[in-house]
Amino acid sequence: MIVEIPKNSANKYEYDGKLGVFRLDRPLYSPLHYPGDYGFVPGTLADDGDPLDVLTLMSEPSFTGCLIEVRPLGFLELVDSSERDQKILAVPKSSPRYSEIATVDQVWPHMRREIEHFFTIYKELEGKETRIEGWRGPIDARKLILDCRQAYLDAKAETE
């Protein structure tokens, strides 16, 4: 994954592919912070037209632009302003702290609720609604990543 927003940030950064830089999209309207490093899987295209989103559990934040090799545990399915959206939940492959966590079901229940809560309310003050649909496991996450990779390759082939 490529980190756009480090853990504990209250700013939403996005990668601008046309300019090749990370830019500030907006500060969060709510007094919240991202519960993990947040970014995207390069070379993917999700249903929302952007690369597939990833939230990586971290003890300490990394930095914007950091490449982290991750292991997907599953994903959170949600509806964001009437659009389907998925957030892969992952852990760094190199971290011994998460070596025994293989699926989203093994993530501490309170941490899962914190993540759900964040994605439920982080856009409320912007007047946007987000609804949680549930968690899916690592097999579904790998399939989602492969499907989004294929969508990216198909879109790229159409423009060449």
Where are these regions (language model features)?
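Hydrophobic N-terminal alpha-helices or hydrophobic patches in metabolic proteins across all domains
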Residues: 1-160
